[in-house]
């Protein structure tokens, strides 16, 4: 599916597959946190034929405002892969609970999830 050289950076670990159950968000979706994973990429695929929202910001320094965020409407037949270090909001399911196949780094050293609270920005996404 995804080669380990695409998923893992320096600190070890291996590629893992899991199923994540995303709770639906009413629109407009209120954004609360951005996160990135410094040691591995992540890929997500909807298993329930449900569309979802994707919110990202450039890899690197913490985003400083909502102006640095980019939102996309993803169809159920589109997967998404975030390169290591790419800022993103956790999965935003629409309409109903949705299962996602997740390809992620497991194990290894170091903290692989860095979060940034963006509640004070009061960001809402609507399509």
Question: What is each of the regions a protein language model found here?
Answer:
Residues 12-14, 37-39, 47-49, 67, ...:
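Short connector loops at helix/strand junctions that flank enzyme active sites
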Residues 86-113, 117:
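A short beta-strand-loop micro-motif that forms or neighbors metal/cofactor-
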Residues 114-127:
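Long, intrinsically disordered, low-complexity Ser/Thr/Pro-rich regulatory/activation regions
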Residues 1-8:
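Short, small-residue-biased leader/transition segments that mark boundaries at the very start
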Residues 73-87:
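Conserved metal-binding segment of the jelly-roll/cupin
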Residues 42-45, 80, 91:
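His/acidic/aromatic-lined binding-pocket segments of jelly-roll/cupin-type domains
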Residues 48-71, 111-116:
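A short beta-strand-loop-beta hairpin characteristic of the jelly-roll/cupin
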Residues 15-54:
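Helix-adjacent hinge/juxtasegments
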